[in-house]
Amino acid sequence: MSKLDNYIEQIAVVVILYKEEFQTVVSCLNNIKNFKIIIIDNANDKNLKQKLIPHYNFYKYILNKENIGFASAAYQGINECVTDYAFFLTADCLINEENIFLLLEAKKKYKDCYLTSPTFFDQQGNLTYNGGLLPENGDKSTPLNLEGDSCVETVITTAVLFNIDEIKKIGSIDKNFFIYFMDDELCRRIKQNKKSVIQVYNSKAKHAHGNLKIDNRLKRIFFRNYHFTFDELYYYFKNNTHNKILNETRKKIFKYFIKIFINLILLRFEKSIYYFSKTLAYLKFIRKTGKF
């Protein structure tokens, strides 16, 4: 068995989908078709599956009946893997075999490294954000201008490679998150266990930081603000640094209730949905954690 064939046998690629265009998925899969591919589709898109099945030899193709969130789908994907390593990938990220192999080589090269991730570029070849600071430590929007592999506090789980047993050892993915802050919490846990997260300089990927794939504007406003508010509160709760943000949210809740009804009366539905979503997320956090 050649070195490349050996690498392919060690890695399963977990692709998490939600309302993806056929051509977007095809472009992604064409780069990774030699790996064991596990599809987790949170949109239960049977038509997409029927179109793809004849062209690819999937290891598993799972249709979730409802959108369980990126975190739960990632957890699900890990448990479906039979390889030593898993590579998480979203359909809007293009990376070829060679660049995935570079992630594996870096993972094996650096002692105590638990997670490797490529350097992202947009369609025009401009450097875009991946690795950086945890939310509590600074801004996350500025891309790192690397000159070599770099140990970072956190990366985006759009494209990450890890050893399955190692990630399970520290508790795997926390399914209480939906989509936001999941990557930060995992990376923070890795750091707490005195392990490292590496952004690999020579491993390149094209990634267009995407928008929510929800057509209805009111649903999109609710989805973003409900899940972001809960996930943010839960992230800081897990870090035991939630008191400040919780107090700030608590002070606003009564005003939110008033604004919900005022904006309904004034037919400003977007504003009403915004305040409703944040209020509901706060109440969910209280039920989940018992923290007021």
What function would you assign to each model-found segment?
Residues 154-162, 166-171, 176-204:
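A short, conserved alpha-helix in the catalytic core of glycosyltransferases
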Residues 86:
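Short aromatic/hydrophobic "clamp" motif used to bind/position activated sugar donors
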Residues 223-231, 241-292:
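Non-catalytic, C-terminal membrane-associated alpha-helical segments of glycosyltransferases
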Residues 64-81:
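Glycine-rich, basic loop-to-helix element that forms the pyrophosphate-binding segment
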Residues 134-153:
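Short, flexible, basic/aromatic active-site loop/helix in glycosyltransferases
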Residues 15-33:
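Short, well-formed alpha-helical segments that are part of the catalytic scaffolds
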Residues 98-129:
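Conserved donor NDP-sugar-binding/catalytic core segment of glycosyltransferases
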Residues 41-50:
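A conserved acidic beta->alpha catalytic loop
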